[in-house]
Amino acid sequence: MKLKNSLWAKLQLRFPNLSFYAAKKEANNKTESLAGSVVDKRVPVFKPLILLLPAIFVLTLFTIIPFFLNIKYAFTYEKSPGHPSTTTFTMDGFKNVFESPTFGVAVRNSIMYGLIVLPFVMAISLIISSCIATAYRKWARGIWQTIFFLPYITNIVAVSLSFIQFFSTFGMFNSMFHIQVSWLETGDIYSFRPLLPMIIQGVWSGLAFNILISTTAMLSVDKNLYKSASIDGIGGIKQFFHITLPSIKSTTTFLITMGIIGGIKVFPLALFNNKPSDAISNGASTLMLFIYERTNVGSGAVQVASAAAICLFIIGILYSTLIRGGFGTIMKVSTNYGENYVWNKIKNSEVMNEYQAKKK
């Protein structure tokens, strides 16, 4: 190494411009970064549009067009099917939806499912992710992440069959508590009992994705923050609430949004042998299940299903606004509490008292 350095020094003395040419050649050999090649260069408008065309086509065909067709079918009715000239404006679809007793049960179950499952999934996944992220050895983190991710890739039919057996009248759940309750075969459309299997299955299946994303986010938090907090004598619980949670706020917001969408769109058909009539007659109706079942009910079915879909859209927006606002308020209060706590500590510290005394 010393020989190379001395040789390079002699060459530089003999050829003063050697360093300049070497640096220039090295710069020319470097590959251009993505930011420099795409962002900083003028690109014709049609090039990015060509790349976006497949996505735009799929989005238009399967989302935008069906959305407007759904609005059309919800407010119109063809007196003679196949003859557009007989189409008239009507609100009968919404009338049939609101008069249906199963629609109220569907709204009740969907909202209760979302309100219970989302907080449990978020709380449990954050706790487990925190334990995995603090694991000392990297191979242990990988093993635990793989174990907790297995429910996400497990076949939903196999999972549903397992839950059907688990919650049957003579299943394992009843055996553990020495009871005989028909959780999935109540015979009552207003029953609350099917909610328990639905909620437990929802929590179990929702943990996998949340744990994977939360663990990845926690591992990306700057470790120097934890070291500084440990030096100041801050415990692990306070570090979690005042360092970890604020640092993964964007990830938490994403998971809450996905949880809200999944909660309002719960579809427990597999728990009832893929028979929507069985699910509805046993009190397990949800908004998605109600819409699915109404599309197969004869004349005017599409109109009623379209009206129910619009109701689902409106309920989803209101539900999302309330839940996101609630979680946002909790995070804001927690952050403000932490800031006030630190500021009060600083104000009451000996250093601050000495500074104030000198200032006077």
Per-segment meaning from a language model:
Residues 44-355:
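A structural signal for multi-pass alpha-helical bundles of membrane permease subunits
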Residues 1-42:
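Short, Lys/Arg-rich, polar N-terminal cytosolic tail immediately upstream
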Residues 357-360:
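Short, charged juxtamembrane terminal tails flanking transmembrane helices
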